Amino acid sequence: MMQLAVLICLSLVVNTFAQSCVQDSDCGNDDQCCLYSACATKPGEMFVEESGEGALAKVACSVPAPRALGFVGIHL
């Protein structure tokens, strides 16, 4: 019974994270932006960030951030 309660709790937490990831994205409801939210930009894109010592170019990461799954199974 305890395992089921933990599993339900984890599923709710993960689903909440996935929803907030899409909603908090600057790209509206674009799942691709959510997918690469841990990157500076989407793969292949660059942006320039101003700093005290001049502009610093950042390149997007080539591997997407792990997406939240709708269901998480664990074995206790």
From Swiss-Prot:
**What does the entry state regarding organ or tissue expression?**
Expressed by the venom gland.
Which Gene Ontology MF annotations are present? Answer: ion channel regulator activity; toxin activity
What keywords were assigned to this record? Disulfide bond, Ion channel impairing toxin, Knottin, Secreted, Signal, Toxin
GO terms for CC?
A: extracellular region
Note the coiled coil stretches, chain numbering: none
Per UniProt, subcellular location reads as: Secreted
| Primary localization class, coarse | secreted
List the cysteine pairs that form cystine: 21-34, 27-39, 33-61
Q: Which domain of life is it from?
A: Eukaryota
**Signal sequence interval, chain numbering:** 1-18
According to its UniProt entry, what is the function of this protein?
A: Probable ion channel inhibitor.
Entry note about domains: The presence of a 'disulfide through disulfide knot' structurally defines this protein as a knottin.
What's this protein's name? U14-hexatoxin-Hi1a
